[in-house]
């Protein structure tokens, strides 16, 4: 029997100076993540920013925040390890933060 899924707040910063690489890899990253999103395992996600940009300026993304429903923190680490953003050196896996979370 599978364990009950629990919610976790996941924050993973980008490595320095990878904004251009992030933009190139965004489409394959989103395609790979789509099954988890469609299954309701990732009900919320977005980019963290270095600062808010003025209208028309490039958005200064510097990481990702998401809610992941998983059996364990180890399962989340495995999901993040296999993501193209980790494999191709966008996310700083060593600075991954996983927090137990409860949506309200």
Curated annotation (Swiss-Prot):
Domain of life: Eukaryota
SUPFAM superfamilies on file: Dimeric alpha+beta barrel
Functional description taken from the UniProt entry: Part of the gene cluster that mediates the biosynthesis of fusaric acid, a mycotoxin with low to moderate toxicity to animals and humans, but with high phytotoxic properties. L-aspartate is suggested as fusaric acid amino acid precursor that is activated and further processed to O-acetyl-L-homoserine by cluster enzymes aspartate kinase FUB3 and homoserine O-acetyltransferase FUB5, as well as enzymes of the primary metabolism.
Induction record: Expression is positively regulated by the secondary metabolism regulator LAE1.
Applied relevance: Fusaric acid is phytotoxic to plants such as cotton and banana. It has been shown to induce programmed cell death in plants. In addition to a mild toxicity to animals, fusaric acid exhibits acanthamoebicidal, antioomycete, and antimycobacterial activities.
InterPro entries: Dimeric_a/b-barrel, Sec-metab_biosynth-assoc, YCII
A Pfam family reported for this protein in Swiss-Prot or TrEMBL: YCII
Pathway: Mycotoxin biosynthesis
Family statement drawn from the similarity comment of this UniProt entry: Belongs to the YciI family.
Disruption phenotype: Does not alter fusaric acid production.
Listed PANTHER family: PROTEIN YCII
Name used for this protein in its record: Fusaric acid biosynthesis protein 2
Lineage of producing organism: Eukaryota, Fungi, Dikarya, Ascomycota, Pezizomycotina
């Amino acid at each position: 029997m599978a364990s009950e899924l629990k919610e976790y707040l996941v924050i993973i910063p980008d490595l320095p100076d990878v904004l251009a690489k992030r933009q190139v890899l965004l489409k394959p990253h989103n395609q790979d993540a789509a099954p988890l999103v469609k299954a309701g395992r990732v009900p919320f996600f977005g980019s963290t920013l270095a600062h808010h940009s003025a209208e028309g300026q490039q958005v200064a993304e510097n990481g990702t925040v998401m809610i992941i429903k998983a059996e364990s923190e180890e399962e989340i680490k495995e999901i993040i390890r296999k993501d193209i953003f980790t494999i191709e050196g966008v996310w700083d896996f060593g600075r991954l933060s996983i927090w137990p979370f409860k949506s309200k």
